[in-house]
Amino acid sequence: MSVLLAEGVTPELEELWKRALHDVSAKRGGAALLATLCDGTPPEELLAAAVSSGALWVFHDDALKGFALCRAQLIEAVYVASEFRRQKVGTTIVRHLLNDAAAPVDAYALPGDRAMKSLYESIGWKARLLTMRGA
C-alpha cells in the first residue's frame, strides 16, 4: 500500500471523486465546503486542476481506496471509499502528508463529521476555528 501524488486522472480516480462530491454535498455544510474548495471552478474540473498542480494524494493498494486534497499547508478534503473505511486509510494518508516538507498545519472538517474530527484528534490536532455563515 502506498500514498502517492496522483499522476493523472484515471477512470478509477474520477469515479471516486464523483462519489466524494455526492457524499460531501449531502452533508451539513457540504455545499459551502465545495464552494470554498472550487472557488468558481466547476467541481468536476477541480479534480484535473488538483492533479496537475500536485495537490491530490491518493492511497492505492490493490485498489484506489482514498485521496486527500492538500493545498498551501491546508488539508481541504480527505475521502475514503465507503468499503475501505475503518481500516486506517484516512489516517495513513494524513500521516503521510504530515511527513511532507510542506506539511499541512490546518484541515477542514464538516460540522457533525465525527469520523473526520476523530481522525484529526488522533494525530493530536484540536478544533480551533468554527466558521459561521448566514443563510
What do these predicted regions represent?
Residues M1-R19, D23-V24:
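Conserved N-terminal entry element of GNAT/NAT acetyltransferase domains
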Residues K18-L46:
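Conserved GNAT-fold acetyl-CoA-binding loop/helix
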Residues T41-V58:
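A short helix-loop-beta-strand connector motif used in the catalytic cores of GNAT acetyltransferases and
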Residues W57, D62-Y79:
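Conserved beta-strand in the GNAT
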Residues L64-G66, G90, L129:
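A structural microfeature
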Residues F84-L97:
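Conserved acetyl-CoA pyrophosphate-binding loop and the N-cap/start of the following alpha-helix
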Residues R85, D106-E121, W125-K126, R133-A135:
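Conserved beta-strand-loop-alpha-helix junction that forms the acyl-donor binding cleft
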